[in-house]
Amino acid sequence: MTEKYIVALDQGTTSSRAVVMDHDANIVSVSQREFEQIYPKPGWVEHDPMEIWASQSSTLVEVLAKADISSDQIAAIGITNQRETAIVWERETGKPIYNAIVWQCRRTANICEQLKRDGLEDYIRDNTGLVVDPYFSGTKVKWILDHVEGSRERAKRGELLFGTVDTWLIWKMTQGRVHVTDYTNASRTMLFNIHDLDWDDKMLDVLDIPRAMLPQVRKSSEVYGQTNIGGKGGTRIPIAGIAGDQQAALFGQLCVKEGMAKNTYGTGCFMLMNTGEKAVKSENGLLTTIACGPSGEVNYALEGAVFMAGASIQWLRDEMKLISDAFDSEYFATKVKDTNGVYVVPAFTGLGAPYWDPYARGAIFGLTRGVNSNHIIRATLESIAYQTRDVLEAMQADSGIRLHALRVDGGAVANNFLMQFQSDILGTRVERPEVREVTALGAAYLAGLAVGYWQNLDELQEKAVIEREFRPGIETTERNYRYSGWKKAVKRAMAWEEHDK
């Protein structure tokens, strides 16, 4: 019998990846392609949907060729994706009517201000689990329909379709036969009622978005359709798992029980805590979102999103030219014993949880004559850990659960300095898994469970090997002293930009 594999497609903010996994959850082959970031105006971020598709489909062909695996050896494909990014395209031609508006894009801040003025904040929080912020898809879709001539009428006639990136990829992979999303992605649109598990008529009405353009919403682990892309001949492969990247990582870390949490250090930082079948309403600026239970069914989670994590290290490299490679940041940070009193607040696109201030801007505080580039590099790394503590404090207050260990993943977890400082500043154990590709793992697990490739999560439990554990190495007084300096710095970076700009 030929060995069968699972493929995870991981469509991220800066690159598209394909990962092949075997039955023991080992990574057999990986392929990755970066694509262009488009910045039409300050604070605006776009992608070309056709380039997203081209990069993702080519990685799929490439990853199979690399491993010398034929398409009939693929048991299923799972998809995980950058969330909230909004795409609108023509049903007939499959052609986008505008670029994808990316989750980081702040262009809809004025639409969000109007929603607040109209007194909708409580309704939105209670029903969608979200805060009013340009981050989510709903206001992005409204912006496209407002600015592309004739598009709203066409959407009403059923000629246009909306989707997050998962929906767009599946539409392309099935040649326009399947228009679908899953609960985790739908819960990020600000258009979805997370309690009724259906699109919210009031939100569609408020944002003037025709229901006809929305995808069908399904659970995260089931067969949605078939694709024969990248295959020799006509082998049809089931597409059987979908989850937004952060929910996929939560599942890949096997945080499927109430009170388990993970933090992903990518472009941004995303901490999620599974709250089981209970949708916990946050009083502390966190999001209530949908996650996956043990067999991909609906569970709820609390989430805190930090917009700038790895992106702030890229800023040190690309704009400030203080390092030539992101990996060098650890070396330079450890050349000094502390930050010499410096705090970097990387609020380049405003602040996420728990502050939610789109008008905050980046700042460096505490500069004195003795500060050198190493101090600034170290302070930038430390800012990632401080922002994570901001989120964890809010999470513990909302859930009433004291976290005993934080599971971590994402590119920046290779940085031992950052992981140790993270443990120091949280006063909590930090667990780094052996397999770092947990987002892809999550998508693969969801797809594999749907087609019976794996029977249940117990089979996967032993795959969750912790490679290294970091334990707090500083005293509580020192920890709190440093953290209070951070809070002071954040306060001063807030509300920098004028509201009416």
Curated annotation (Swiss-Prot):
Pathway: Polyol metabolism; glycerol degradation via glycerol kinase pathway; sn-glycerol 3-phosphate from glycerol: step 1/1. InterPro entries: ATPase_NBD (IPR043129), Carb_kinase_FGGY (IPR000577), Carb_kinase_FGGY_CS (IPR018483), FGGY_C (IPR018485), FGGY_N (IPR018484), Glycerol_kin (IPR005999). ADP binds at T13, R17, T267, G310, G411, N415. Activity of this regulatory enzyme is affected by several metabolites. Allosterically and non-competitively inhibited by fructose 1,6-bisphosphate (FBP) and unphosphorylated phosphocarrier protein EIIA-Glc (III-Glc), an integral component of the bacterial phosphotransferase (PTS) system. It comes from the Bacteria. Keywords: Allosteric enzyme, ATP-binding, Glycerol metabolism, Kinase, Metal-binding, Nucleotide-binding, Transferase, Zinc. It catalyses: glycerol + ATP = sn-glycerol 3-phosphate + ADP + H(+). GO terms for cellular component: cytosol. Glycerol binds at R83, E84, Y135, D245, Q246. ATP binds at T13, T14, S15, T267, G310, Q314, G411. Homotetramer and homodimer (in equilibrium). Heterodimer with EIIA-Glc. Binds 1 zinc ion per glycerol kinase EIIA-Glc dimer. The zinc ion is important for dimerization. This is Glycerol kinase. It comes from Salmonella typhi.
